[in-house]
Structure formats: C-alpha cells, structure tokens
Amino acid sequence: MAVKVGINGFGRIGRIVLRNALQLGNIEVVAINDPFIALDYMVYMFKYDTVHGRYKGTVEVKDGKLVVDGHAITVFAEKNPADIKWGSAGADYIVESTGVFTTVEKASLHLQGGAKKVVISAPSADAPMFVVGVNLDKYDSKYQVISNASCTTNCLAPLAKVIHDKYGIAEGLMTTVHATTATQKTVDGPSHKDWRGGRSVNNNIIPSSTGAAKAVGKVIPSLNGRLTGLAFRVPTLDVSVVDLVVRLEKEASYDEIVATVKEASEGPLKGILGFTDESVVSTDFTGANESSIFDSKAGIAISKSFVKLIAWYDNEWGYSRRVCDLLVYAAKQDGAL
C-alpha cells in the first residue's frame, strides 16, 4: 500500500522528491502541477541532472502523461493551487514545493481541488513545523497543512537535540556554509531586498541571513531563544555543512560528545543522524539519505563547556528524503496507510 501524492512545483525539490519516492515504494506520485514546464521538457528535466546524475529508469510521454518506469503521472499546468484537480488524479497528500505558497492560507488552496493534506517543503510562518527524528510526536491528524522546515533546520535540529538532551545547550551560534540554490544570480543583478544576494554566485562567498537556527526553537521549545545563526553561500552545486558552536550547561570532553552522537546515530536517530570519522569533503555526501552527518574529525573544543560541532548534509537529496518520510508518517497517523 502506498500514499497517493501530488507534487506542486517541479523544481529541484519537486524532482528529487519524485526520485526518492520511486526508490522508497511506499509513496505513489500520481500527479504533478507546474505551469512553467511543458510535458516534453518535464521528461528532459527529470531524466538529466547535473548533481544527481541521469535517471536510470525510463522516462517518457504517453497519452498526455509523464510516464516513469511504466508508472503514469497526471500532469497539470495551473497557476492557482485552487484550480488543480488533485482529486480527479487521486492525489490525497500534496508536496507544496514551489516556494511560493508557504503559509497555511495559501497552501490550503490545494484542499479546494480535492487534496486532504499539504506538506510544505520550506519553512512556514504559521504552519506547524516538523523535523523527522525530533518532534514527530507533536503531530496531530487535525493539521491540514504542515511544514517540513528547511534543509538546514533538518541538519541542525537532530544534532542539537542529542547534545541538548545529554548536556544542555545554554546558547549557541550556527553558521551554514551552503551550496548554491536556484534563487541566486549567475552574474551580478538586481536584488532589492538582499543586496549581497544579487551578487554572482559563481565567484563569491556571500553572507546571507537564515532562520534555520531560530527555527530549531520551534521544534525543540526548550531551545527557543538559545540559538541563532547565519549562512555563507558558496559556489558549489550541492551539499552544505553546519558549523555549530555551543556553550554547554553540563561539562563534557570532546570524546564524550563524539561517543554520545555516535550512539544516537546507531540507535534512535539511525538513518536521520549519520556519523563519520573519516577525512571527508563535501562531494562525499552527494546523495546522502541522512538529514545530518556528524563529522567527528572536524569538530574542536576549547574547554569542556565550549565546543564547535560540524555536520554535513545534502541539502537537496537528504531533505527530499525527509519530505517523503514526513508524508508517510502523516499518512500512517491519519489512517491513510
């Protein structure tokens, strides 16, 4: 049995959610909506990917549908979510991955077309936010619109939870060295709200704001107000890294912290929080399924209460895998799976 899903927005996350869904088998993508991508171009965009490689199965157009490995997917091209006939395609759960309809009010428009629930693949100002491995116990089936938070929050929150549960985080600062995303400029151009963000991504390290650290306080309330951070956008295509500096409430040696994280990665957070003690670099994590991979060799401590912790994440693939996990979890809790 599989949860029947529709995807709104066939961009980076939309396409990679589909790739993940095809791997997992417990999600059946029955419909895709994107008003800006013609069906034949949709085939091309899904088949070829600069980061994750060529799709190894079959991708074609047949009878006006996108057919992947023999599985037919209905395609819509509506600009208004309220006009998408999700119900006619049998799509119960919607992945809202346009980056546009990120509030409860806007995302709820999907419900008018027959959808039962919407998962926003981005942070939301007012939708309940969930991070797999951190706060799924707070999920309630009454929620019709939920958020999977951001890729960076998904990396940071599991690590922060492990450290906070064991040692207590008094306060912390996070920096994410973040790969390029689609909203950035290839050459210098206008960006009235974020002047630095208008500079070319190809030859710059660009400081940027991020709400990822503060958002951890929404999924771990006891950390609310204790974490904040910033981002540096760098000229790489994929895979990012979180640098978390924390002051601990309970003293611990760096080796003790490493042992704690490793234990969690092999136990309750297996598959969510990874662990490496090898001399790795960013491309070694392309296609990593985990939300966060702790790098024990990269962290440092200045004392038993002040430490820097490093965790890698594939901001495209790992995040999309969690979108799928959240869909399946919600469907099970709702009795739909």
Curated annotation (Swiss-Prot):
Residues annotated as catalytic: C151
Glycoprotein listed as a keyword: no
GO MF terms, alphabetically ordered: glyceraldehyde-3-phosphate dehydrogenase (NAD+) (phosphorylating) activity; NAD binding; NADP binding
Name the UniProt record assigns to this protein: Glyceraldehyde-3-phosphate dehydrogenase
Zinc found in the keyword field: no
Cellular component, GO, one term: cytosol
GO BP term, example: glycolytic process
Gene3D superfamilies assigned: Dihydrodipicolinate Reductase, domain 2, NAD(P)-binding Rossmann-like Domain
